[in-house]
From Swiss-Prot:
Belongs to the peptidase C85 family. Residues 1-100, 141-190, 411-496 are annotated as: Disordered. Residues 322-327 are annotated as: His-loop. This is OTU domain-containing protein 5-A. GO terms for biological process: negative regulation of canonical Wnt signaling pathway; positive regulation of TORC1 signaling; positive regulation of TORC2 signaling; protein K48-linked deubiquitination; protein K63-linked deubiquitination; proteolysis; regulation of immune response; response to lipopolysaccharide.
Length: 560
């Protein structure tokens, strides 16, 4: 904290500016403490109209009683004593000190506190220490004690008459007690005790209210830093807050100048310095400027003072904490965002940006997770498809190999069966005589173009062997299943050479007939197709047998 040099107090209290009116007195020593917030700011909205000008005439007893009643209802605010019968109102009388009463809108003039009554200061700017020190040094027995520091208040003895001092007029107009060098010397408490109280204060505020005290830099701008942290979220914006506050005070100088004892322009110019402290006047101005209540906490969980704006609303208040009667910190509610409230931003919702960022982050995370899961599913599906394809290929290969083995096995089985059947037929037909009757098949096929040339016409006219008839009339032989049993039936008395010559053809036909038509892409054979194939085989066998018989029956030329 920057301590300004102490100026000598001014003892201009009690000097009448109007000699013709003995009841007019100056009420010039409010000595408003910068950080003591026990003054009675009237809560709620107030009209923008400026208050009436300062009246130097002493109020009647009835009005003072009303003010005392109103002031006594507010905490930590003393009321000025009523005007006594023995008090003198002349311009030369020595008054104890100026008594400030009421809230911001009510300031009373100084009253002489003689007749053995001690002078007492009250008002929004005076701290307990100052009031106690002033009241303890009050007048007794018609004399007056020392006045309030910095505001003026002459000390007189004997008859109690004190005149204005040029040395005391220089320091008139300071409103804050901590602007004096003796402010630091007023701290009589033990530092360890103060530290313990501060720790208890922070702990109680956090446990009961959930608030957190945010430390501000101690450079004389702590109040503006705390408000900047509440409004802008950055304590380094204190210069902007100070500038706006001073501009607001200048625009409403007709109202706020009633609470400043010094020249208002000088006061504003001094407060524009970055190392100059702020007090209750600046708090009220900022409450109206941001239209947010300002709550001040000190060693307790309930605010000791609340400054209200002009219009009532439901916005979160600006919370500051007051420490050691000299420093302000910011009180933050971590569960509710208040940054930006009061700046006049349209459709502004505190914390909406953080919520939007959180939603966007969650959405992006979900999309990334979904894409990752889809990629994993595709990988698993690709592996599954490749595995299925490999399995299908392996099954097809094994099935094809098994089919080839089955075909080879089936191709070997009909050859053995046909050879056995042919040997049995040759043994059975060796004892039969040749049958010269012509078969019906031969009759029907006589005019066929397949008859041999005219040289063998006589051979064709002979009755053929009834092989075709036997092939059609006899039931299938069990030696060869299916339509191949006709291949086992030959002429009644064929020679062994003819049977042997038929073995390859019969074996091939048997293999073809044993195979399923589905192997060739065909359906099951019908009866007509089976009958046609049997007739063709029978005809071919008959023709072959006729040729062989004709060759054996031709007599040799030398035998005749």
């Amino acid at each position: 904290m920057t301590i300004l040099p102490k100026k000598k107090p001014n003892s201009s209290v009690g000097v009448s500016d109007h000699p013709d009116d003995p009841d007019r007195r100056t009420g010039s020593d409010p000595h408003q403490h910068q950080h003591q917030h026990s003054h009675g700011v009237r809560p709620g909205a107030r009209p923008r109209a400026s208050p009436p000008p300062w009246s130097y005439q002493a109020a009647p007893p009835a009005s003072r009683e009303d003010r005392r009643t109103e002031s006594s209802s507010r905490p930590q605010q003393a009321s000025p004593p009523p005007v006594g019968a023995g008090s003198s109102g002349g311009p030369g009388d020595a008054t104890g000190m100026a008594c400030v009463s009421g809230n911001r809108a009510e300031l009373s003039g100084g009253v002489g506190c003689g007749g053995g009554m001690g002078g007492c200061c009250s008002g929004p700017g005076l701290s307990k220490r100052r009031r106690q020190a002033t009241c303890s040094g009050g007048v007794a027995g018609g004399g007056t004690g020392p006045g309030a520091a910095g505001g003026g208040g002459g000390g007189g003895g004997g008859g109690g008459v004190g005149g204005p001092s040029p040395e005391q007029e220089e320091g008139a107009g300071y409103n804050s007690e901590d602007e004096y060098e003796n402010a630091s010397r007023l701290q009589s408490e033990d530092p360890a005790t103060v530290e313990q109280q501060e720790h208890w204060f922070e702990k109680a505020l956090q446990e009961k209210k959930g608030f957190v005290i945010k430390k501000m830099k101690e450079d004389g701008a702590c109040l503006f830093r705390a408000v900047a942290d509440q409004v802008y979220g950055d304590q380094d914006m204190h210069e902007v807050v100070r500038k706006h506050c001073m501009d607001y005070l200048m625009k409403n100088a007709d109202y706020f100048s009633n609470y400043v004892t010094e020249d208002f322009t000088t006061y504003i110019n001094r407060k524009r310095k970055n190392n100059c402290h702020g007090n209750h006047i600046e708090m009220q101005a900022m409450a109206e400027m941001y239209n947010r209540p300002v709550e001040v906490y000190q060693s307790g969980t309930e605010p000791i003072n609340t400054f209200h704006g002009i219009h009532q609303n439901n916005d979160e208040p600006i919370r500051v904490s007051y420490h050691r009667n000299i420093h302000y910190n910011s009180v933050v509610n971590p569960n509710k965002a208040t940054i930006g409230v009061g700046l006049g931003l349209p459709a502004f919702k505190p914390g909406f940006a953080d919520q939007s960022l959180m939603k966007n982050a969650i959405k992006t995370s979900e999309e990334s997770w979904i894409e990752q899961q889809m990629l994993e599913d595709k990988k698993r599906a690709t592996d599954w498809e490749a595995t299925n394809e490999a399995i299908e290929e392996q099954v097809a290969r094994e099935s094809y190999l098994q089919w080839l083995r089955d075909q080879e096995k089936q191709a070997r089985q009909p050859r053995k069966a046909s050879a056995t059947c042919s040997s049995a037929t040759a043994a059975a037909s060796s004892g039969l005589e040749e049958w010269n009757a012509r078969s019906p098949r031969q009759r029907s096929s006589a005019p066929s173009p397949e008859i041999p040339d005219p040289a063998h016409s006589d051979t064709a006219a002979k009755p053929p062997s009834p092989a075709g008839a036997l092939a059609l009339s006899k039931p299938p032989s069990p030696c060869a299943p299916g339509p191949s049993n006709q291949a086992c039936v030959g002429p009644d008395r064929p020679t062994s050479s003819s049977l042997v010559s038929l073995y390859p053809a019969l074996g091939y036909r048997a293999i073809m007939q044993e195979m399923s038509p589905t192997a060739f892409g065909l359906t099951d054979w019908e009866d007509d197709e089976i009958l046609a194939s049997v007739l063709a085989v029978s005809q071919q066998e008959y023709l072959d047998s006729m040729k062989k018989n004709a060759m054996h029956r031709e007599p040799s030329p030398d035998s005749s």
